[in-house]
Curated annotation (Swiss-Prot):
It comes from Staphylococcus haemolyticus (strain JCSC1435). Carbon 2 of the heme B porphyrin ring is defined according to the Fischer nomenclature. One of its GO terms (molecular function) is protoheme IX farnesyltransferase activity. This is Protoheme IX farnesyltransferase. Its main location: membrane. The gene is ctaB. InterPro entries: Protohaem_IX_farnesylTrfase, UbiA_prenyltransferase, UbiA_sf. Its EC number is 2.5.1.141.
Amino acid sequence: MSKEQTLSQPSSRVSFKELQQIIKMGLVQGNLIPAFAGAWLAVVMSNHSFLSSIPQILLMLIGSTLIMGGACALNNYYDQDIDRIMPSKQNRPTVNDRISDKNLLILSFGMMLLGEACLFLLNVPSGVLGLIGIVGYVSYYSIWSKRHTTWNTVVGSFPGAVPPLIGWVAIDGNISLIAIALFLVVFCWQPIHFYALAIKRSDEYSLANIPMLPSVKGFKRTRISMFIWLVFLLPLPFLLSSLGTTFVVLATLLNLGWLYVGLTSFKKATDQTKWATKMFIYSLNYLVVFFVLVVVISLIKMI
């Protein structure tokens, strides 16, 4: 067997770092924050004991990690053709043949089945929401909208916003206005976050023939869309007024700060990529700060 043939065969083992790439662990971890916040708020608002709820919360987090990781692995399987074209994806194990398609599918479906088992052990609503998230991300986003419409980011935002709902129903069993408010925050946050990333990688998406908004409609249209979604975020803290005035004020300032950064940095930026980078960095911090506020302020109210 030649050296070239040996190198082209998928490795029988992948490293832990490569496994993290396959299941998109960074994305998974980011979604666990709102999932935990949803469960935490359900504990607080329904007067459950936090200590007695720890097993439910842990099972919810494990189940959520598994279904999200499995869905992301399946996304990587389906996207291999376009990932091979995009320069930023060349280190993915699915692109450089570090894992076979067979093992990738076993990993993906195994994780999703185990994750769904965990969520259904909690209650039926948690399991159903998990299924909605999987089907929405894999079918409606990855297979359909990502390759066919500039609305792909918005379509993908729906399953991407399911984690706080899963967190809430894992404890409460029913969806409430508070849970819907958390869902809407994550839903409106995602287009801004991913449009900023799409601006940074506009040339790559064009090369791969993926109809991301910046690649098809241009920077101006994308920037307008980002500001529209920012405006949609502005009233959402008021849906969480049960957390108190302090939370509403701080969350509103967080929203206004993002709007301010978007408006002022655009005037100063010498190119659109620098502006998109600032918006992207703020988006990463925004989600963490918002849900930390949710947890901390509700904890203070308990005390």
